């Protein structure tokens, strides 16, 4: 019997994926024994309980479910490798699929133990959760209609003459606001899966996302393409580059610290590099991961 526990207060959008496969809502509810939340504070608590809950936002290539319900992606695979080094087997990971905007509130409410969504480290987020050291670094990208008839090659281009879609809770909102995009020209979608239809139907003129995400989406439909070449946005004189990491509840410092120790060792290996290359990350993006620390990113 699975160790899955579901809170009565868990958001309806969340889905639990025991042992890497999607569990139906009915099956999950049948396993409900109490309103006990996840929220493990220490690694020893996780081991004593027998499982760990990890939330993902179904975003390629970071962490997503394939057509068979298997959880895949660079973030998910790194989490598996690191946790295995800490004595937690992959089959003892309970995956939770939710929206990106629900990740931090879910951590704060102890609905899961950690996230594996490549969430960019930002000072305002550091006030709400704690992060591991970075395990990814990425620039920006943009999805446009096939042929790019309006010749969009930067967020600034769209800011001046079009509507741009972003995922709810994503960093791109901050960028659009800094670039002066009017609120009425910002289209918010719930998940990356909605990006192709938003652009293909003309609801939005472009979709702003991490470069790897935009590139992956472009491969999925002949109605859209990646805007190339693309110029990363410049805000306050700085080219925008993000560093992503795993996040934890603020009370879970012991769990985060133990995870960090194993992550930093794994980050030095060729296996780590090959894993990211296998998901389409550029060598220069992988090389940039150690350039920033979580402490620096939280304070700047």
Swiss-Prot record:
Subcellular location: Periplasm
Key words of the record: Amino-acid transport, Periplasm, Plasmid, Signal, Transport
Any Pfam family hit: SBP_bac_3
SMART domains with a match to the protein in the record: PBPb
One GO cellular component term: periplasmic space
Domain of life of the organism encoding this protein: Bacteria
GO BP: any one term: amino acid transport
Endpoints of the signal sequence: 1-27
MF terms in GO: ectoine binding
InterPro entries, alphabetized: Ectoine_EhuB, Solute-binding_3/MltF_N
Function summary: Probably part of the binding-protein-dependent transport system y4tEFGH for an amino acid.
Record family assignment: Belongs to the bacterial solute-binding protein 3 family.
Protein's name in the database: Probable amino-acid ABC transporter periplasmic-binding protein y4tE
Organism: Sinorhizobium fredii (strain NBRC 101917 / NGR234)
Lineage of origin: Bacteria, Pseudomonadati, Pseudomonadota, Alphaproteobacteria, Hyphomicrobiales
